[in-house]
């Protein structure tokens, strides 16, 4: 069969395992070199396609590509750049098709979250209208775990493991010092609309009274009086209180506790730090000495503590994306399907992008305790397998060894395009 080229791009916030998906895509393409010629990657995501800034991944060694599996962040560069509505910004989509046509790219693998799924779907639709034979596959990725259809999202399991571990270790620290020093510790985690990462912090507690004593979810309206009462109860009973709070914690009217008033490139509200906001409330209302921390980029970059389950799944969806494309399944996403909890078993199936794009999966109410401050056993059964297993990177000079890519650029064939 005729050879055609493939294009891969990373989108949005990166994770500890998105490069494992890249590894899965690239290695699968190399195994099918009778049908796929060169593999190009967009420098800084979809912007690389629009500006024709392409990296020739085919020139990277097998060893360098294999090292992507244990390298965090986005090896080819990512971006927060959302292609707008196709009717009013058609030129951007047409530009993508022009670049793909110029470089004989027939396979488009877009690795990202919900917004990326929407872009992938639109590109697929426009290429069909323009008569260009393009197969577009979305490769799932998001630490927020809010993609629908898939049982869980690659990237989440490793963040969950990091947050659960950090909560456990910080709790021991606070417990050691609470008699004469800090009484309250607040850990802020990612999760704008969905509280999956905050929920993972609850895995640190194995029995009644174990920290974290409060988990604050975006799905539960923030009640200041109720929160303060629970904090005070915990300090009186245990001597200290550990709180895991989602960055998206909000009041009943939908206002974020830490709304900065700004928006990002995707139109999402930018949040200004719920941990110091909540800690300040506790100091004002109860007078307790506190410390707070924001996990921020650390939680999604911690490849040294990645979940093996997450690494395996991230690689598998990348690999499956290529299989779907070669099978002619256009506008699809490889989705993880859970077969059983104990023993944990899973597989990867194809999901229509139309069912994924611009939809969010929130914490079910029966995953959150009735009082709103913790997780249920049902939630624990769901989360526990996702943090299982260790997949340590190789170390050199005491530090993790990461992939070093040559990133040879492809010669441009088209006129310059202004974003």
UniProtKB/Swiss-Prot annotation:
<feature type="site" description="Important for catalytic activity and substrate specificity; stabilizes the transition state when the phosphoryl donor is PPi; prevents ATP from binding by mimicking the alpha-phosphate group of ATP">
    <location>
        <position position="115"/>
    </location>
</feature>
<dbReference type="InterPro" id="IPR050929">
    <property type="entry name" value="PFKA"/>
</dbReference>
<comment type="function">
    <text>Catalyzes the phosphorylation of D-fructose 6-phosphate, the first committing step of glycolysis. Uses inorganic phosphate (PPi) as phosphoryl donor instead of ATP like common ATP-dependent phosphofructokinases (ATP-PFKs), which renders the reaction reversible, and can thus function both in glycolysis and gluconeogenesis. Consistently, PPi-PFK can replace the enzymes of both the forward (ATP-PFK) and reverse (fructose-bisphosphatase (FBPase)) reactions.</text>
</comment>
<dbReference type="GO" id="GO:0005737">
    <property type="term" value="C:cytoplasm"/>
</dbReference>
<feature type="active site" description="Proton acceptor">
    <location>
        <position position="144"/>
    </location>
</feature>
<dbReference type="InterPro" id="IPR011404">
    <property type="entry name" value="PPi-PFK"/>
</dbReference>
<keyword id="KW-0324">Glycolysis</keyword>
<feature type="binding site">
    <location>
        <begin position="190"/>
        <end position="192"/>
    </location>
    <ligand>
        <name>substrate</name>
    </ligand>
</feature>
<keyword id="KW-0479">Metal-binding</keyword>
<dbReference type="GO" id="GO:0006002">
    <property type="term" value="P:fructose 6-phosphate metabolic process"/>
</dbReference>
<dbReference type="Pfam" id="PF00365">
    <property type="entry name" value="PFK"/>
</dbReference>
<comment type="similarity">
    <text>Belongs to the phosphofructokinase type A (PFKA) family. PPi-dependent PFK group II subfamily. Clade 'B2' sub-subfamily.</text>
</comment>
<feature type="site" description="Important for catalytic activity; stabilizes the transition state when the phosphoryl donor is PPi">
    <location>
        <position position="141"/>
    </location>
</feature>
<keyword id="KW-0963">Cytoplasm</keyword>
<dbReference type="GO" id="GO:0047334">
    <property type="term" value="F:diphosphate-fructose-6-phosphate 1-phosphotransferase activity"/>
</dbReference>
<feature type="binding site">
    <location>
        <begin position="142"/>
        <end position="144"/>
    </location>
    <ligand>
        <name>substrate</name>
    </ligand>
</feature>
<dbReference type="InterPro" id="IPR022953">
    <property type="entry name" value="ATP_PFK"/>
</dbReference>
<dbReference type="InterPro" id="IPR000023">
    <property type="entry name" value="Phosphofructokinase_dom"/>
</dbReference>
<feature type="binding site">
    <location>
        <position position="13"/>
    </location>
    <ligand>
        <name>diphosphate</name>
    </ligand>
</feature>
<keyword id="KW-0418">Kinase</keyword>
<keyword id="KW-0808">Transferase</keyword>
<dbReference type="InterPro" id="IPR035966">
    <property type="entry name" value="PKF_sf"/>
</dbReference>
<comment type="pathway">
    <text>Carbohydrate degradation; glycolysis; D-glyceraldehyde 3-phosphate and glycerone phosphate from D-glucose: step 3/4.</text>
</comment>
<feature type="binding site">
    <location>
        <begin position="297"/>
        <end position="300"/>
    </location>
    <ligand>
        <name>substrate</name>
    </ligand>
</feature>
<protein>
    <recommendedName>
        <fullName>Pyrophosphate--fructose 6-phosphate 1-phosphotransferase</fullName>
        <ecNumber>2.7.1.90</ecNumber>
    </recommendedName>
</protein>
<feature type="binding site">
    <location>
        <position position="247"/>
    </location>
    <ligand>
        <name>substrate</name>
    </ligand>
</feature>
<dbReference type="GO" id="GO:0003872">
    <property type="term" value="F:6-phosphofructokinase activity"/>
</dbReference>
<keyword id="KW-0460">Magnesium</keyword>
<comment type="subunit">
    <text>Homodimer.</text>
</comment>
<dbReference type="GO" id="GO:0046872">
    <property type="term" value="F:metal ion binding"/>
</dbReference>
